């Protein structure tokens, strides 16, 4: 409820209250009479100071007009008082004895007055009730709680277009097709294509699913309704199904249109057995949604777009084609996507010359579009805090650290000993990673406290990777255990600072053994599967599907991996202890070191050989033959530029080639005087239906026709005054007799024998 409606409602209530008060004020005929005690009135009567009197029997009140005002009446000559029940006759007799003029009035109650007394307060209460109901949305309480709470975007709202979306080109392409279908349906309908009924956007939080929906709303040019999945189900039973029906009814009235349901997992969760004894309100709502999306009812022109972070818990009936024809993954952007996202969010912001967005894109692997937008915004806020005018490279660097680790803890007082331990701990991580051959190089190491960490070392990959080898994962274990190894080597005892490192190492080692099958002892087997009920979040119901002996072997393999990585880190730090001391000293002095400074410190550090203790293939001997080289590697060897432009998919080239061929055929047919189907224009007749209106095409080579087809003109029914019918279809070869001629069937058979290819 906006401010204008609130002001209007309050004004209406004030007017009603003012009118009611005016009615009661001006209808009161006792105005001008001074209320006095009953004893004062009796004193005036006994003192013969009453000129006239009026007894209101129904109201049990006495009005006196005095001959002269006095102190008891405060000088007023008109007084009014109440008298007890049954004393009207005594008052009349007393006034008559004093020769005062007495009149008795018995008022009859006004029906209008009675109604106003009871109805006006009721109207006020109803008005307040309606006002508060509308202020709370009108759907939670009061009337219309079963109505849909979907909001239709108006033209006045700020529009988001596909130009504002970056990093998810595949999703944009899929959604742009829907927008193009709504605006140019003829191109698709000519091919018999049908518009998708539903599109599901799924992916991690912050990847731009809702932003894509807003872009579709800004460019579709059709009514766009948006609603959250949690808006369907509330405290009233049956409200969810009612709102689903009302939503689609509203959409059908505005067809063609688009409905966007955000967080559809709130209502589309997989149906279960109703654990806990609760009602099936959610299932009832889901069933109604399934029927509305693809049931007996017609929903032509209504496209449903939904977004979720958990596609794995959605009901299978909701995901089938016909309901959600397209399921579009919206994942974290790659390097090119991050560059595009940073360019979009930095547009309109003053950037300094040292603000390297390409380098920033390389250092933000794994960040979503929302994270990158937050980085740019944090850099702008930091610049404004320091009264700067342009966003610099250091501001972007600080913004990345704030987004990853939180703000710097400036007020924390750290002792020299703790600072020294932190320097050696982070130095151990950095040196161990630098000496391993299969790990991303360290970009930055710092001992500045942020959030819950006392320092961190950042390893930035050179390029995006979708796969990790066993050697890379072992190198990650060595990197994680480098801090604990440095503590034990230098200070002869561990600290609690390695808790997150141990947790991360355990997670990596256990996944290598139980998920990725990298242990030769346990084999390529996945151990442990989820058997949980969807209403328990699935993961809460995980049960082991292996024996206790296998569980013990898993623990042994995990411990073996971590111990090997721990030992490798220890040996690296022992060999390069002087380098570790130099690195720790630089960290204590500068607090933060970057790649160029680390390269000068680690100039003498050589890469270690790979750990081979887990390279056993169980009797399977790998081949010594190297793999083939990729076209890119061959181009680099030849000194050619690479990468080359990515070719279009094969199906696109095939479609383009077929389209060009069809257009060429149509143009040739038009030049020879034939219509769209290869027949003379205007020769199609209803009488042709006896034999079929087109020449049959059995998929044979061009120039071949069926024996005896079309029938001879002498066998066709004749129509007076009408020319012989023609049969549109595939053009006949040059020199072939016209189907409408009198050529004998034998001659046609000879022609077929000459043109038909031999089979055998």
Curated annotation (Swiss-Prot):
Q: What topology in the membrane does the UniProt record assign? A: Multi-pass membrane protein
SUPFAM superfamilies xrefs? FtsH protease domain-like, P-loop containing nucleoside triphosphate hydrolases
Which molecular-function annotation in GO is an example for this chain?
A: ATP binding
What ranges does the record list as Low complexity composition bias?
650-669
Compartmental location: Cell membrane
Q: Any idea of its EC number?
A: 3.4.24.-
> What Gene3D superfamilies does this protein's entry cite?
1.10.8.60, P-loop containing nucleotide triphosphate hydrolases (3.40.50.300), Peptidase M41 (1.20.58.760)
Stretches assigned to the Extracellular side: 27-110
The keyword Membrane appears for this protein: yes
Compositionally biased region (Acidic residues): 740-750
Residues the entry annotates as binding ATP:
203-210
UniProt-listed PANTHER family: ATP-DEPENDENT ZINC METALLOPROTEASE YME1L1, METALLOPROTEASE M41 FTSH
Q: Subunit arrangement?
A: Homohexamer.
Q: What is this protein identified as?
A: ATP-dependent zinc metalloprotease FtsH
Q: Which organism is it from?
A: Mycobacterium tuberculosis (strain ATCC 25618 / H37Rv)
Q: Which gene encodes it?
A: ftsH
């Amino acid at each position: 409820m906006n401010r204008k409606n609130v002001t209007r409602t309050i004004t209406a209530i004030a007017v009603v209250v003012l009118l009611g008060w005016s009615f009661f004020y001006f209808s009161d005929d006792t105005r001008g009479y001074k209320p006095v005690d009953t004893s004062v009135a009796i004193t005036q009567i006994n003192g013969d100071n009453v000129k006239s009197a009026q007894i209101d029997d129904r109201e049990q009140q006495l009005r006196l007009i005095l001959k002269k005002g006095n102190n008891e009446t405060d000088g007023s000559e008109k007084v009014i008082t109440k008298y007890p029940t049954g004393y009207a006759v005594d008052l009349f007799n007393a006034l008559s004895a004093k020769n005062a003029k007495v009149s008795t009035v018995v008022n009859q109650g006004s029906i209008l007055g009675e109604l106003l007394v009871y109805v006006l307060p009721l109207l006020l209460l109803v008005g307040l009730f309606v006002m508060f109901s509308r202020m709370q949305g009108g759907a939670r309480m009061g009337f219309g709680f079963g109505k849909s709470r979907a909001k239709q975007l108006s033209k006045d709202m700020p529009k988001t277009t596909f130009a504002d979306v970056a990093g998810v080109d595949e999703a944009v392409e899929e959604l742009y097709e829907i927008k193009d279908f709504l605006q140019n349906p003829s191109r698709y309908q000519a091919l018999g294509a049908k518009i998708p009924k539903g599109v599901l956007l799924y992916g991690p939080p912050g990847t731009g699913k809702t932003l894509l929906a807003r872009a579709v709303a800004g460019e579709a040019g059709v009514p766009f309704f948006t609603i959250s999945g949690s808006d369907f189900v509330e405290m009233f039973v049956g409200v969810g199904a009612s709102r689903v029906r009302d939503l689609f009814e509203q959409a059908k009235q505005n067809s063609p249109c688009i409905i966007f349901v955000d967080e559809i997992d709130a209502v589309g969760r997989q149906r279960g057995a109703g654990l806990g004894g609760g009602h099936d309100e959610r299932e009832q709502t889901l069933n109604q949604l399934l029927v509305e999306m693809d049931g007996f009812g017609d929903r032509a022109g209504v496209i449903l777009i939904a977004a979720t972070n958990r596609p794995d818990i959605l009901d299978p009936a909701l995901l089938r084609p016909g309901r959600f024809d397209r399921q579009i993954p919206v994942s974290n952007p790659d390097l090119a996507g991050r560059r595009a996202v940073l360019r979009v969010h930095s547009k309109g912001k003053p950037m300094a010359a040292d603000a390297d967005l390409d380098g920033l894109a390389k250092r933000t692997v794994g960040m979503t579009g929302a994270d990158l937008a937050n980085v740019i915004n944090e850099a702008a806020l930091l610049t404004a805090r320091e009264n700067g005018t342009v966003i610099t490279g250091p501001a972007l660097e600080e913004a990345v650290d704030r987004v990853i680790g939180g703000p710097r803890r400036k007020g924390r007082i750290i002792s020299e000993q703790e600072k020294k331990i932190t320097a050696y701990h982070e130095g151990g991580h950095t040196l161990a990673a630098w000496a391993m051959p299969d790990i991303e190089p360290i970009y930055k190491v710092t001992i500045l406290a942020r959030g819950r960490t006392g320092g961190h070392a950042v390893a930035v990959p050179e390029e995006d990777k979708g796969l990790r080898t066993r050697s890379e994962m072992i190198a990650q274990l060595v990197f994680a255990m480098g801090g604990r190894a440095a503590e034990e080597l230098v200070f002869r005892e561990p600290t609690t600072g390695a808790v997150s490192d141990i947790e991360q190492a355990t997670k990596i080692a256990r996944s290598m053994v139980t998920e990725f099958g990298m242990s030769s002892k346990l084999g390529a087997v996945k151990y442990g599967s989820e058997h949980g009920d969807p209403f328990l979040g699935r993961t809460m119901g995980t049960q082991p599907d292996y024996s206790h002996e296998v569980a013990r072997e898993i623990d042994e393999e995990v411990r073996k991996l971590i111990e090997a990585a721990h030992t490798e880190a220890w040996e690296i730090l022992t060999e390069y202890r002087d380098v570790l001391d130099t690195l720790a000293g630089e960290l204590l002095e500068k607090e933060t070191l970057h790649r160029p400074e680390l390269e000068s410190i680690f100039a003498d550090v050589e890469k270690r050989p790979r750990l081979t203790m887990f390279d056993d293939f169980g009797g399977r001997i790998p081949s010594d033959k190297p793999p083939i080289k990729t076209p890119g590697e061959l181009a680099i060897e030849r000194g050619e530029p690479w990468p080359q432009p990515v070719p279009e998919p094969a199906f696109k080239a095939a479609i383009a080639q077929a389209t060009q061929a069809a257009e060429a055929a149509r143009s040739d047919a038009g030049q020879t005087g034939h219509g769209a189907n290869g027949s003379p224009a205007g020769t199609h007749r209803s009488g042709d239906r006896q034999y079929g209106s087109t020449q049959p095409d059995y998929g044979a080579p061009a120039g071949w026709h069926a024996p005896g087809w079309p029938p001879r003109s002498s066998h066709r029914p004749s129509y007076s005054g009408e020319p012989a019918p023609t049969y549109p279809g595939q053009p006949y070869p040059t020199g072939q007799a016209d189907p409408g001629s009198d050529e004998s069937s034998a001659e046609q058979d000879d022609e077929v024998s000459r043109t038909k290819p031999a089979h055998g």
